[in-house]
UniProtKB/Swiss-Prot annotation:
Binding site for ATP: 13-20
Record-stated family: Belongs to the IPP transferase family.
BP terms from Gene Ontology: tRNA modification
Species of the source: Vibrio campbellii (strain ATCC BAA-1116)
Name of the protein in question: tRNA dimethylallyltransferase
Record gene name: miaA
Length: 310
């Protein structure tokens, strides 16, 4: 049955690992169309700090699901799954192969496994929880979560109000715990997927790449890009767009919480932490072929062979 399903390619990897270069090279060789799997690239006017493909790169290889939202908007894994499935269907209808490229592992997971039937956010209940936090403190609410959902409470730190609030909200809306609901899987992906991950073999090399890229972003005008966002006055640090690595730290600088140099240092450190989390995800991933960032030609041949042999 799976042999009759259309082929899709996943090209995953930590930030600054060379995914975009490899994807563009692959598109020049095969009838693939790129879908971005990146929770930062979805935002308009956030080009430099996200290392978004530039005009030349996009002319060589258009990317779907970039520049689709204003930074004031939110976008969930469910939104991504819906949009990615539509894009994949469109690509297959054109007789081409979907190539999904990026490092937002939660999006890949949602696409592969489907989504748990979690209730939509309820502003009234969320506001009620925030009010309780103001009067009682988040530690008391964390104790409440321990009583109803000890598994989630063990994973969520008392100083993580966003995740703590969501866990309580889910229970109050549905009467079921976050743990119960997340163990219920949705629809699996109706494609034959070949999965690849690219990264340098040496972690120090990845750190060097991250620092170099951040420095280049600053030279390219990241501070000016951030100032334009800051000046809008309708954005704030709790938005997913401003929580993106680099943007959060530059916002702190513009808010007067740190110096420019401190913001750059914090941004580099945060990007390294992101890369570490991405690699941790990938090491636990099944059916994955690893590629070496330091040998793009070999990586290209490996992916080419996978397509040609299909």
């Amino acid at each position: 049955m799976t042999d009759k399903l259309p082929l899709a390619l996943f090209l995953m990897g930590p930030t600054a690992s060379g995914k975009t270069e490899l994807a563009i090279r692959l598109r020049q060789r095969y009838p693939v169309e790129i879908i971005s799997v990146d929770s930062a690239l979805i935002y308009k006017d956030m080009n430099i700090g996200t290392a978004k493909p530039d005009e030349r790169e996009l002319s060589l290889a258009p990317h779907r699901l970039i520049d689709i939202l204003d930074p004031s908007e939110s976008y969930s894994a469910a939104d991504f799954r819906r949009d990615a499935l539509q894009a994949m269907d469109d690509i297959v209808a054109e007789g081409k192969i979907p190539l999904l490229v990026g490092g937002t592992m939660l999006y890949y997971k949602a696409l592969l496994e489907g989504l748990s039937p979690l209730p939509a956010a309820n502003p009234e209940i969320r506001q009620q929880i925030e009010q309780e936090a103001l009067t009682k403190g988040w530690s008391v609410l964390h104790d409440e979560l321990k009583e109803i959902d000890p598994v989630s409470a063990a994973r969520i730190h008392p100083n993580d109000p966003q995740r703590l609030s969501r866990a309580l909200e889910v229970f109050r809306i549905s009467g079921k715990t976050l743990t119960e609901l997340t163990q219920t899987k949705g629809d699996s992906l109706p494609y034959r997927v070949k999965q690849f991950a690219i990264a340098p073999k040496d972690r120090a090399e990845l750190h060097r790449r991250i620092e170099l890229r951040f420095d280049k972003m600053m030279e390219a005008g990241f501070e000016e890009e951030m100032k334009a966002l800051y000046a809008r006055k309708d954005l704030h640090p709790d938005l997913p767009s401003i929580r993106c690595v680099g943007y959060r730290q530059m916002w702190e600088y513009l808010d007067g919480d740190c110096t420019r140099d401190e913001a750059v240092f914090r941004g580099i450190c945060a990007t390294r932490q992101l890369a570490k989390r991405q690699i941790t995800w990938l090491r636990s991933w099944n059916d994955l072929t690893w590629l070496d960032s330091d040998n793009i030609e070999q990586a290209l041949e490996t992916m080419s062979e996978a397509i040609a042999s299909d």
